[in-house]
Amino acid sequence: MPLAIESGSRAWGFSSPDSDYDCRFVFVRRAVDHVTPWTSRDVIELSLEGDLDANGWDLRKALQLLLKGNAVIVEWLRSPVIYCGQAWFRDDFLEFARQAASREAIGRHYLHLGERQRRVYFGDGTSVAQKKIFYALRPAAALRWLRMHPTEAVAPMHFPTLMAECEPPSDLRAEVVDLMDRKAVTRELGVAPLSRVVAGFIDSEFELARGVFEGGGVGASEQMILRAEQFYRGVVERLERESGTIDPFRPA
């Protein structure tokens, strides 16, 4: 398990006093586990214990989803809260992700994620769960960041950093600071009215993004698929060496 991080509000920077610990991890199977005609499960889901929610993906799954434009693994790699892991793995994987991630696909991911939160949870805006406001606000800020950084595809995960780098209007900054201050002292299910400033920012960024990211997009190139395979093999081989395995294809 070369990487385990916090993926929820504690890493985003807007946790509540009773927020869960959302631990997510990447695991890599031994070389010998690949020499079989049977497909191994690519997800590990642990039972919820208290305020700890933990599950992880096989590196193979993480790479496949990355090449399809899923932003989840990109965010894991940028989490500011690392529970355990190996620095070289995170650094190398993040470098590969920067090259492999499709701006268009990542943009569509954030747009669809944010629009769903807006559509399902905002209602008339008089009483909205605070965390749902952030669940739409964060994708909107990520879309703005992508628009302002036309050569980048990997936005900051940490929300205060994301907001600072996307240079929002001053009235929005004040509203966001107030929201974060309130959420920091309110239980996870606390509610708040949706301000016009926040709603306007969210709707504006989604509207702008529709014109940029709603196209069908292009899948990963053959060259990038080959590079993903090379990266995967390199990780498996290095972990085998570091574990002291002499014959990686001999069962334990």
Name each model feature, range by range:
Residues 1-5:
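Helical scaffold of the NTase/Pol beta-like nucleotidyltransferase catalytic core
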